[in-house]
From Swiss-Prot:
Annotated EC: 3.6.-.-
A GO term for molecular function: GTPase activity
Compartments where located: Cytoplasm
Domain called TrmE-type G: residue spans: 211-363
Binding, GTP: 221-226, 240-246, 265-268
Keywords assigned: Cytoplasm, GTP-binding, Hydrolase, Magnesium, Metal-binding, Nucleotide-binding, Potassium, tRNA processing
Main location: cytoplasm
Organism, as annotated: Thermosipho melanesiensis (strain DSM 12029 / CIP 104789 / BI429)
Protein name, UniProt field: tRNA modification GTPase MnmE
GO process terms (BP): tRNA methylation; tRNA wobble uridine modification
Functional description taken from the UniProt entry: Exhibits a very high intrinsic GTPase hydrolysis rate. Involved in the addition of a carboxymethylaminomethyl (cmnm) group at the wobble position (U34) of certain tRNAs, forming tRNA-cmnm(5)s(2)U34.
Cofactor annotation comment: Binds 1 potassium ion per subunit.
Entry binding sites for Mg(2+): 225, 246
Length: 441
């Protein structure tokens, strides 16, 4: 049985309107007491005054929702007050004094899940929508809110359940029904491969959600920090004519064509005896290993140098874009690289061409990532365990093991899928998911 909770659902601060929710068995009684409304129609907006202990609190709009037709599945009230901090707090205080308690983080959405209004995947999608920092992330999360991933998981469940039912029929009628092990092997092999592809696409999906890591590398004074500042549209890095100014890794975030990128500016790579600069260079080399795409910045006024050759050896085999910078100052180079881009980080010349090149370089990540609807690490880890159980079932079938061993593998895979969508769950799991939400959601 749920108790009655309340919280401000809109962001803290001053605005035109604030939203306060009350959920639970006492919610309607509390609202009627504060408004003086007795007979109400559900899901209709009323404009009235809130009164408490003889004082007018605010003129508000209020909506009554009747269980189960609400966000939570319980009796629910939404009050729209004027958006001042004080007036909002006064209204909330009156609600709490009238019999509600303050809601915990994500408790409204958690109640919706527990009442079957949404799946666990949809609950996670709501959080991802709120936290989305790029158009691509938002679109993926909205697809999950519509139930896209849930449909895919139900398909996996259905295939496994079909095989299990075939196996269990042979347990009940061993002399009458012969199991078609070849057909089951083909089906499970196909399903295992589908889950494997989903996992690979999902890792790219999470990469898109978290931001594709783009590392800027180059020799000292090639204009890396100027390029970082130009891409970020702010002076994040110190820019001077003195080589080796950047000693540490500097990070920022941008969006290009709806794709989120985490940009990493690194210390200039060269041979040096300076102890501090050496540490910065070591960190630069580590960032190169983490990069999804590398901007290899070269100086058009000096051409391709020994230092550039040293850096090229470090990044060869990686997903890099050769970027000739300072093209407004010099043209001291011949075409050396395929796909090289000419820019001036100082005045922005060629920047659009560079952005287009960056997007094309990560095209595979974008296409695979947006094809997947898995957007959390929890979901990926569960699918990896599902894959392991399916792989075990296929191997056991191939080696001619008893069919009841295959049944155990499939039941374990099924349990994992149930955990993914929330058919089965633990209190710790729910606390871990919903504690990330804000109070009021």
């Amino acid at each position: 049985m749920f108790d009655t909770i309340a919280a401000v659902s809109s962001p803290h601060g001053t605005g035109a309107i604030a939203v306060i929710r009350i959920d639970g068995p006492k919610s309607h009684d509390i609202a009627k007491k504060l408004t003086g409304l007795n007979k109400v129609e559900y899901r209709r907006v009323y404009t009235t005054y809130l009164n408490f202990e003889g004082d007018i609190l605010d003129q508000v709009n209020i909506v009554f929702f009747k269980s189960p037709n609400s966000y939570t599945g319980n009796d629910l009230i939404e009050i729209y007050t004027h958006g001042g901090i004080l007036v909002t707090q006064n209204v909330l205080d009156a609600i709490l004094k009238s019999g509600a308690r303050i809601a915990k983080r994500g408790e409204f959405t958690k109640r919706g899940f527990l009442n079957g209004k949404i799946s666990l995947v949809q609950a996670e999608a709501i959080y991802q929508i709120i936290e989305a920092k790029s158009e691509v992330s938002l679109k993926m999360s909205l697809q999950n809110l519509k139930g896209k991933l849930g449909e895919e998981i139900e398909y996996y469940r259905g295939e496994i359940l079909n095989v299990l039912s075939e196996i269990e029929v042979t347990f009940d009628y061993p002399d009458d029904i012969e199991l078609d092990e070849k057909s089951i092997l083909n089906l499970l092999s196909k399903l295992k491969d589908e889950v494997g592809r989903k996992i690979e696409d999902s890792k790219k999906s999470i990469m898109l959600n978290n931001g594709i890591v783009m590392t800027i590398v180059g020799k000292p004074n090639s204009g890396k920090s100027t390029l970082l500042n130009r891409l970020l549209l702010e002076d994040r890095a110190i820019v001077t004519d003195i080589p080796g100014t950047t000693r540490d890794v500097i990070k920022g975030e941008i969006e290009i064509n709806g794709i989120r990128f985490v940009i990493v500016d690194t210390a200039g790579i060269r041979e040096t005896k300076d102890v501090v600069e050496k540490i910065g260079i070591e960190r630069s080399l580590k960032e190169i290993q983490k990069a999804d795409v590398i901007l290899f910045v070269l100086d058009a006024t000096t051409g391709f140098t020994k230092e550039d050759k040293l850096i090229l050896r470090k990044i060869e085999g990686g997903n890099y874009i050769p970027v000739w910078n300072k093209c407004d100052e010099g043209n001291n180079f011949n075409k050396i690289f395929d796909g090289e881009i000419k820019i001036s980080a100082l005045n922005g010349e060629g920047l659009k061409n560079l952005e287009n090149k960056i997007v094309s370089k990560v095209k595979n990540i974008i296409e695979s990532g947006t094809a997947s609807h898995v957007i959390t690490q929890r979901q990926v880890e569960i699918l990896e365990r599902v894959y392991t159980h399916l792989e075990s079932a296929v191997n056991n079938l191939n080696m001619g093991y008893e069919i009841d061993l295959i049944s155990i593998d499939l039941r374990r895979a099924l349990e994992e899928l149930d955990m993914l969508i929330g058919r089965k769950f633990s209190d710790d799991l729910l606390d871990n998911i919903f504690s990330n939400f804000c109070v009021g959601k």
